[in-house]
């Protein structure tokens, strides 16, 4: 369990008082003649006086290059028309989610129509039965077939799809880790196909990169969702190459409505079981290797990262199957005896026993303080049910403070066994507000508003799904807390833009680009 409270860095914050700082003394005491000449120049003098920040400052002092503005790229490729929503705007998020759901449904249906025969051959006829059940297309005599057996079929089919995806990912990673001469024919073909996709992705990213400014945080956008999915999918389960509709594990599940059937029959919401359409580390690697080929071992790392997300989903469905369904059956039987209802139907009361509070579902839950809400907000990030972990990430942009803390496990019907460690969300939130109240940088009005906010519950602004693993999400949160250079790049522009950038850095991660400068060579030629 960990807790970190830290001051946030912004551009200009450190250089503002450069003349009287240790940095200024260091400049005067340690630089050589060449650097002195440079420092005495107009730009150099302005830098030392704290009027100009940037690469010049870091070159003279030998400090990190972090005070210069570089390209910061969000590690996500946005489809056409997509934008990162403001976390404090539920309406904006809701509209985006609905549009995305409709697009996915349409695309998944195309996959079902195109590959139905191959998919049912690979994963069994149960998929069609589940689909017909959801669409009300069951034959007359089958209308009253047992709902519990249909639920089990949906869970089993989903597990099959996830396991197939997991094993294919493992095969590709293994092929990439082998020497080229030791690969089998199948592995050579697999690697070649994957390389072609990476090249297509690299070209698309390169075109976007050329148009970027050396400014704040950038987003790679403009690829259509179909092309993106085909290009970024490591191992399509059915359909190969760069087809515009590939049957990924995610697409098959959506096409046959497995999660919807599970939710409709049991009340268990599995909408959090996702994997990233495009693994953030592959974008980071592509941005690093601009003019050279990406080594196989780097590609293997990205594939293994994506495999981790799929394995996490496998563990989650196994947890539902082994831990939750037996309890579900037991409660169902008890309910039948009490109510004297038909054997084939699941009573709604049974489903309600397995509903969990919205704020404990595995998502990023967004809250704001009741007063000064634009500046003071926090995220409560909850892991998959089988892990039963969560963390708190709070921001006060008024006084530039960030607070990260691992929280205690929470009890609900779908969780694992409890472990009494860590604090609750309420305790973390109150301490977070205490920081704002006691900070010397807080104005009297801000402190008074925070005292008022502490006495009441925060405002819940809704939830968002995350596609990466919980571990990756936690690493992103800790990087926001520790990495001063990243903070400088995301804390720029209007407040709503800063909040968007924070959310992007948490959900996807950010890659900061910037070529390293040879300081001795630069000073020699100054």
Curated annotation (Swiss-Prot):
Signal peptide: none
Keywords: Capsid protein, Outer capsid protein, Viral penetration into host cytoplasm, Viral penetration via permeabilization of host membrane, Virion, Virus entry into host cell
Any one Pfam family match given in the protein's UniProt record, by short name: Orbi_VP5
GO terms, molecular function: structural molecule activity
Start and end residues of each stretch annotated as Involved in membrane permeabilization: 1-42
Subcellular localization(s) per the UniProt record: Virion
Superkingdom to which the source organism belongs: Viruses
InterPro entries: Capsid_VP5_Orbivir
A GO cellular component entry from the record: viral outer capsid
One Gene Ontology biological process: symbiont entry into host cell via permeabilization of host membrane
Job description of the protein: VP5 protein is one of the two proteins (with VP2) which constitute the virus particle outer capsid. Acts as a membrane permeabilization protein that mediates release of viral particles from endosomal compartments into the cytoplasm. Permeabilization activity is probably negatively regulated by VP2 and is triggered by endosomal degradation of VP2 and exposure to low pH.
Similarity comment: Belongs to the orbivirus VP5 family.
Protein name: Outer capsid protein VP5
Origin organism lineage: Viruses, Riboviria, Orthornavirae, Duplornaviricota, Resentoviricetes
Gene: Segment-6
């Amino acid at each position: 369990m960990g807790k970190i409270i830290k001051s946030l860095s912004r551009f200009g914050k450190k250089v503002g008082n450069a003349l009287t700082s240790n940095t200024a003394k260091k400049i005067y005491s340690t630089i050589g003649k060449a650097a002195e000449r440079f420092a005495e120049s107009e730009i150099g003098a302005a830098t030392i006086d704290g009027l100009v920040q940037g690469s010049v400052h870091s070159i003279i002092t030998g400090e990190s290059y972090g005070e210069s503005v570089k390209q910061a790229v969000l590690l996500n490729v946005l489809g056409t028309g997509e934008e990162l929503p403001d976390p404090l705007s539920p309406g904006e998020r809701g509209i985006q989610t609905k549009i995305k759901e409709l697009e996915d449904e349409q695309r998944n249906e195309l996959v079902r129509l195109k590959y139905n025969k191959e998919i049912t051959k690979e994963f069994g006829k149960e998929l069609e039965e589940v689909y017909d059940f959801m669409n009300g297309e069951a034959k007359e005599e089958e209308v009253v077939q047992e709902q519990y057996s249909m639920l089990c079929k949906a869970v089993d089919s989903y597990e099959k799809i996830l396991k197939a995806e997991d094993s294919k990912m493992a095969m590709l990673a293994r092929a990439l880790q082998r020497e080229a001469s030791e690969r089998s024919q199948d592995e050579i073909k697999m690697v070649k196909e994957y390389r072609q996709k990476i090249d297509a992705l690299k070209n698309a990213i390169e075109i976007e990169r050329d148009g970027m400014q050396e400014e704040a945080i950038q987003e790679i956008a403009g690829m259509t969702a179909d092309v993106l999915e085909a290009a970024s999918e490591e191992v399509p389960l059915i359909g190969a190459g760069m087809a515009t509709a590939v049957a990924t594990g995610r697409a098959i599940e959506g096409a046959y409505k497995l999660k919807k059937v599970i939710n409709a029959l049991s009340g268990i919401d599995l909408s959090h079981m996702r994997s990233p359409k495009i693994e953030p580390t592959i974008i980071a690697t592509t941005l690093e290797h601009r003019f050279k080929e990406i080594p196989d071992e780097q590609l293997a790392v990205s594939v293994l990262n994506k495999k981790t997300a799929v394995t996490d989903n496998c563990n989650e469905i196994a947890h539902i199957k082994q831990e939750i369904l037996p309890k579900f059956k037991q409660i169902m039987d008890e309910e039948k005896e009490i109510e004297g209802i038909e054997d084939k139907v699941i009573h709604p009361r049974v489903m309600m026993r397995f509903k969990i509070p919205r704020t404990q579902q595995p998502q990023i839950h967004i809250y704001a303080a009741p007063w000064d809400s634009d500046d003071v907000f926090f995220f409560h990030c909850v892991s998959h049910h089988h892990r039963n972990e969560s963390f708190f990430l709070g921001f006060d942009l008024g006084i530039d403070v960030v607070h990260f803390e691992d929280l205690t496990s929470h009890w609900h019907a779908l969780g694992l066994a409890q472990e009494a460690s860590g604090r609750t969300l309420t305790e973390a939130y109150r301490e977070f507000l205490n920081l704002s109240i006691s900070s010397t940088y807080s104005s009297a009005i801000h402190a008074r508003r925070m005292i008022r906010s502490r006495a009441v519950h925060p405002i819940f602004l809704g939830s968002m799904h995350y596609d990466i693993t919980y571990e990756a999400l936690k690493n992103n949160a800790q990087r926001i807390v520790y990495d001063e250079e990243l903070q400088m790049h995301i804390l720029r522009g209007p407040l709503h833009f800063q909040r968007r950038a924070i959310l992007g850095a948490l959900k996807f991660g950010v890659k900061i680009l910037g070529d390293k400068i040879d300081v001795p060579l630069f000073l020699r030629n100054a």
